[in-house]
Amino acid sequence: MEKKNINEVIANLSVEQLAGMIDHTFLKPFGTAENIEKLCAEARQYQFAMVAINPAEVETCVKLLEGSGVRVGAAIGFPLGQNTVECKAFETRDAIAKGATEIDTVINVRALQKGQTDIVKKEIEDMVSICKPAGVICKVILETCYLTDEEKETVCRIAKEAGVDFVKTSTGFGTAGANVHDVALMRRVVGPVIGVKAAGGIRDLDTALALIQVGATRIGTSSGIQIVEAYKELKKGL
């Protein structure tokens, strides 16, 4: 895909549309009930695309977001991706049964690096076969900081052939998060139809817009409010 001019991106993207591209995230291994309540209240207020949470919080978020239009996303095999194929399939079914409407699954990076692409293919195909009949959006997390460009391309091709809804850069727990190079590469491989989610280290508007410019259609961040408020100010000045 041809890189868009940043002014064109801004001209064609409303504040509401930007908010609707953000996955509002709380994936820390610690926290209180108040953290989850705040996350959901903010997502409802700003009309973010979804809340991204660990599977144990799915039922709570479903209740808190009832009638809001905000989706509930569960992180599967998170953050290392080193679960078995069968374990990830169980986690996916369980999260959906509890009300998750989006699934973000971490691939088995080690299997990929050992050349065991059959394992990566199987876990992605299983996720798609579980999610699609349930009407659940499925995303594959590459954890790009650990992969060569060739490995990133391999996963994107497998994901595209399997019929995923999104490929995603990062968990936010790796050595680095999303960057322009990786998002552009992923967009080039999957083409214009499949979504590309940029996540990890996205804390300001400039970074978010740069990633959208090269093909990101979702932004995973815990800084969504700051990004949207900054965009409101930017649009006012135009």
Swiss-Prot record:
HAMAP family assigned: DeoC_type1 (MF_00114)
Function of the molecule: Catalyzes a reversible aldol reaction between acetaldehyde and D-glyceraldehyde 3-phosphate to generate 2-deoxy-D-ribose 5-phosphate.
The active-site annotation reads: 104 (proton donor/acceptor), 168 (schiff-base intermediate with acetaldehyde), 197 (proton donor/acceptor)
Gene name as annotated: deoC
Q: Name one GO cellular component term.
A: cytoplasm
Matches recorded under SMART domains: DeoC
The keyword Iron-sulfur belongs to this UniProt entry's keyword annotation: no
This one is known as Deoxyribose-phosphate aldolase
Q: Where found, per UniProt? A: Cytoplasm
The answer to keyword Cytoplasm applying to this record is yes
One Pfam entry for this protein is DeoC
Mind listing the UniProt keywords for this protein, alphabetically?
Cytoplasm, Lyase, Schiff base
Q: What is the lineage of its organism?
A: Bacteria, Pseudomonadati, Bacteroidota, Bacteroidia, Bacteroidales
The record's family statement is:
Belongs to the DeoC/FbaB aldolase family. DeoC type 1 subfamily.
GO BP term, pick one: deoxyribonucleotide catabolic process
**One term of GO molecular function:** deoxyribose-phosphate aldolase activity
Biological pathway: Carbohydrate degradation; 2-deoxy-D-ribose 1-phosphate degradation; D-glyceraldehyde 3-phosphate and acetaldehyde from 2-deoxy-alpha-D-ribose 1-phosphate: step 2/2
The reaction(s) annotated as catalysed by this protein in its Swiss-Prot or TrEMBL entry are: 2-deoxy-D-ribose 5-phosphate = D-glyceraldehyde 3-phosphate + acetaldehyde
- SUPFAM superfamilies for this protein: Aldolase
Transmembrane stretches, start-end: none
- Stretch forming the signal peptide: none
| Enzyme kind, highest EC tier | lyase
E.C. designation(s): 4.1.2.4
**InterPro entries per record:** Aldolase_TIM (IPR013785), DeoC (IPR011343), DeoC/FbaB/LacD_aldolase (IPR002915), DeoC_typeI (IPR028581)
